[in-house]
């Protein structure tokens, strides 16, 4: 693929994604936007009071659950409040203010797509492979849905993509000044996104020191660069946790205070001490993750995988089984080919690439473990959005699989190789349009 065609396709995909997500954010009904009403309490409070909530105010506390999302990082709410304040200068329409608040998620999703293209350009020699990564990430139905309403998930994926991008650049430059600044910024933003993305903070530390030792950098340089990354991350993200600790008696993460608040103010059946969990019921691994609980239509595994692909509203608007199977087949085939053709030559033969692969895999594994742990011990949730921090690495590997397969074609098939590499992307876009037009729009934007 020549450079002109690549950039034309790239910018059209970015523009198309923005138009789809922004357009959907205008018409998406609030009752089909999970937890949005509870999250909207924070930017509404900021706009009304011109100050940040501490999380214990009644006006930001959910009457049923008894706690507030203001106890957890809420940078997205602060950004939304800025958009709402600007919009309020022109109109007081509730619909316009809601659309303004949703713009944070729209821009987070668009930003993710831009960064994923940059990741593809750094990782792959062929431009069509970079294009494929963006298609796989940006046009997954669930990711588009998350980019249309007020939540922390799309912003968390954006920060993860940013961190991975600077991992790759740092792998090539031994973390030059620009890459240290970029990694620090990514980590600081990630800290203010969602706890399920924190695996990338841990892996950033491990990868940074592993690469610096591999490049045999002097101890002084390692210390100075590590300090720079930490300082930038702390300047961006540290304020919230210090504020939490001061206000809530040392509770940096807000989790203890959240439980105490829920115990005091939640409806009886939602108080932490009364909440039934697989752990309190003594369920086995099989009962928790593989068997279908009473009152549910599918087990944890299927529900999580299907809602990672696309399950809208409060997981009540589903795609037909054939679409889940087609998406699953596309992903499974690409990943299997990656394991056999792409993993060893592209990721295992040079130590920096191996270290990058290990950290990406570890981050995905920790993300999965955290979700499974929370499901068993805290709150049974079979939602694919909790695994969204694994989206970018997973799709990059699937892309690598398809690219490795077409790279095996004979030299005289070079032109066909480009089209065949993009074929899975074309199929993916067709499946997305079917999912979007046939199910997301009727189920969440037009339903009464």
How should each PLM-predicted stretch be described?
Residues 5-36, 44-53, 64, 229-246, ...:
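Transmembrane signal-anchor helices characteristic of membrane glycosylation enzymes that use polyprenol
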Residues 17, 133-138, 187-191:
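Short helix- or helix-capping micro-motifs
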Residues 70, 74-78, 89-111:
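Loop-to-helix entry region of an early transmembrane alpha helix in multi-pass inner-membrane enzymes
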Residues 99-124, 162:
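Transmembrane-helix motifs of polytopic, lipid-linked glycan transferases
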Residues 169-172, 200-234, 246-247:
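Perimembrane helix-loop-helix junctions
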Residues 179-195:
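Membrane-interface alpha helices of multi-pass inner-membrane proteins
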Residues 224-338, 435-442:
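Membrane-lumen/periplasm interface segments of specific transmembrane helices
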């Amino acid at each position: 693929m020549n450079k002109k065609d690549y950039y034309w396709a790239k910018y059209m995909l970015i523009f198309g994604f923005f138009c789809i997500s922004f357009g959907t954010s205008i018409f998406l009904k609030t009752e089909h936007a999970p937890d949005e009403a509870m999250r909207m309490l924070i930017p509404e409070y900021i706009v009304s009071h011109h100050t940040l909530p501490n999380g214990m105010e009644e006006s930001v506390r959910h009457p049923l659950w008894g706690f507030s999302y203001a106890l957890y990082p809420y940078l997205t709410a602060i950004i939304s409040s800025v958009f709402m304040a600007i919009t309020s200068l022109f109109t007081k329409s509730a619909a316009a203010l809601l659309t303004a608040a949703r713009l944070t998620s729209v821009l987070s999703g668009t930003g993710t797509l831009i960064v994923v293209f940059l990741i593809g350009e750094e990782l792959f020699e062929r431009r069509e492979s970079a294009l494929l990564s963006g298609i796989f990430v940006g046009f997954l139905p669930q990711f588009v849905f998350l980019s249309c309403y007020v939540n922390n998930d799309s912003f968390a994926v954006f920060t993860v993509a940013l961190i991975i991008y600077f991992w790759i650049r740092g792998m090539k430059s031994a973390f030059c000044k620009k890459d240290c600044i970029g990694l620090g910024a990514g980590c600081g933003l990630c800290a203010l996104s969602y706890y399920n993305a924190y695996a990338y903070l841990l892996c950033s530390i491990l990868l940074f020191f592993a690469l610096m030792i591999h490049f045999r950098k002097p101890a002084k340089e390692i210390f100075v660069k590590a300090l720079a990354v930490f300082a930038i991350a702390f300047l961006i993200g540290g304020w919230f946790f210090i504020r939490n600790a001061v206000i809530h008696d040392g509770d940096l993460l807000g989790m203890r205070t959240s439980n105490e608040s829920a115990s005091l103010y939640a409806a009886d059946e939602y108080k932490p001490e009364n909440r039934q969990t697989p752990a309190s019921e003594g369920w086995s691994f099989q009962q928790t993750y593989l068997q279908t609980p009473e009152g549910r239509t599918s087990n944890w595994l299927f529900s999580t995988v299907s809602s990672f692909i696309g399950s809208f509203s409060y997981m009540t608007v589903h795609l037909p089984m054939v679409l889940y199977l087609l998406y699953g087949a596309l992903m499974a085939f690409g990943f299997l080919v990656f394991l056999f053709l792409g993993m060893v030559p592209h990721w295992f033969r040079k130590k920096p690439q191996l270290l990058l692969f290990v950290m990406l895999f570890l981050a995905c594994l920790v993300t999965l473990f955290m979700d499974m742990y929370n499901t068993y011990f805290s709150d049974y949730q079979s939602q694919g959005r909790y695994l969204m921090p694994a989206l970018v690495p997973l799709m990059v590997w699937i892309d690598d699989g398809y690219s490795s397969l077409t790279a095996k074609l004979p030299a005289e098939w070079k032109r066909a190789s480009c089209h065949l590499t993009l074929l899975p992307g074309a199929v993916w876009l067709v499946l997305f349009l079917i999912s979007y037009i046939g199910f997301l729009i009727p189920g969440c934007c037009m339903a009464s």
